[in-house]
Amino acid sequence: MRTYKAKYFLSMFFCLFISATLSSAQEKIKINFDNKASIKDWEFIDEAPKNLGDAGPSTWEIKKGPLDGNSLFQGSNIWGSKADTCLMGTFAIYKAEKFKEFTIEMDVFAADNDGMGITWAYESTKKHYRVIMINDGWPEVPVDKIKGPFMKIQKRVSDDKPWYELITAEKGITYKEQAPLHWKFEVKGGEFKLTREDNKIIKGADKEYEEGYIGIQLYAQQGHFDNIVIENTWAVDPRKKVSTTWAQIKKDHN
């Protein structure tokens, strides 16, 4: 009887360990925008009218473009703030899942020199982080005193001026217009890192906002986005999962 019980527990422990290890590895989410159905998990959100100079609205759609067949395209010139002192406009938010720690990669094609970037920990227009870049020497009178060109990491704190808190900025950095670009963005332990195809990097850190949605933000920019790959890197330690479940099994068989 003891031999049987020992074999049973050993077998169960092995199965639990394999199951927990496999479940801790996350499958990558791949979004290629092949057809209109591929945007069913996306929500398109414009800033409140009080924060817009060009009210748009935004025109997000699936359209054939310069990247890889069809892509997600935004063709309007929607921008804010109303006095044009802060880069604002429109969001494309992936609403199928929230993320805490993750890696996202995407191909990008910018039609002009205006603002574009990634948003994360998104809960609303007034609560999220963003990394944003612009080639133009704009805003002319920036609310945070930093004119373009730049890359910035910022935290949205309200729907009123100054809108964002600055986390970090890299001045004088531009991107290629009318050319394929690639972004890789990572969030881990409250630290953020964007790496571009030209090896330009910006890093920052903040832990106030944790979990939320991921998306794209544009300011007066017409652009294509495609071949998005998201990997959820937040996982329960499999050793803790096995330990908890193992304790419950022993309790049930005593």
PLM ranges: what are they?
Residues 80-158:
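Secretory/extracellular carbohydrate-interaction modules
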